Amino acid sequence: MLELKEKLTEFARQNEIQIELLDQIDSTNNRAAQKCYGAGDVIIAETQSAGRGQRGNSWSSLPGQNLTFSVVLQPDFLLAERQFRISKTAALAVADTIADTGLTPSIKWPNDIYIGNRKVTGILIENDLSGAYLCRSVIGIGLNVNQTDFDPTLPNPTSLSREAGHTFDRAEIFIRFYQHLANRYRMLAEEEISDKNASQIDTDYLNRLYRLNEEHTFIDGRTGEHFTGTITGILPGGDLEVRIANTGQLRTFLFKEIEYVI
């Protein structure tokens, strides 16, 4: 934690934000919900006893090896029906950060980050609404940085260190992420306020999308049946669009209605 504290305390001062560094907590997202944090503030914990991922999964991480944190945003310019764009923004910020290391990340819908067929980052986003607009978003991120040994029951974990063959400075990785998030978030706000038809965020997300235009085996989360299909795109609300191989039918799936077979 010391190497994080020294660099991130100065980074927080320069950017006029609060970065709270904790040894242990139940969940950084939970803490963000319980205390009053401003836009751009961050909670980082070495250990989370109840770290959460998508689909209700837990997120485990060895102390001192990775980055587990939450960032608070106030996207009051974003309509609730377009909230999936926050997921795109966060996923792209992580992907941009990993790409800076020379590795090649992809985004597994909706917002897991993969290197090859292995998961390096999980993202959990929790939004609050005020009328038709978002008023607050908490972006929870678990980024595997230097951990190389994982629980054997986990299906396909990896880390930056395992993929690159060397360790990384966690503070530098976090600072790069925060800078990329600020850039992507600024891009999101500009696109929403100007109501641009062409979206760089949407284009970049598709370009990073795991298994896009590739035939793949999936599980229908509603029936448990395996099927083969090809991801063709993402609808504005975030639904995954898949062309079914044996019928040619184009179907859309909500989160938890489809699983990848990896």
Describe the residue ranges of each PLM region.
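N-terminal lobe of the biotin/lipoate ligase/transferase fold
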Residues: 1-100, 119-121, 168
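Long, positively charged amphipathic alpha-helical accessory segments at protein N-termini or as interdomain linkers
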Residues: 2, 14-15, 76-79, 85-105, ...
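Conserved active-site carboxylates
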Residues: 112
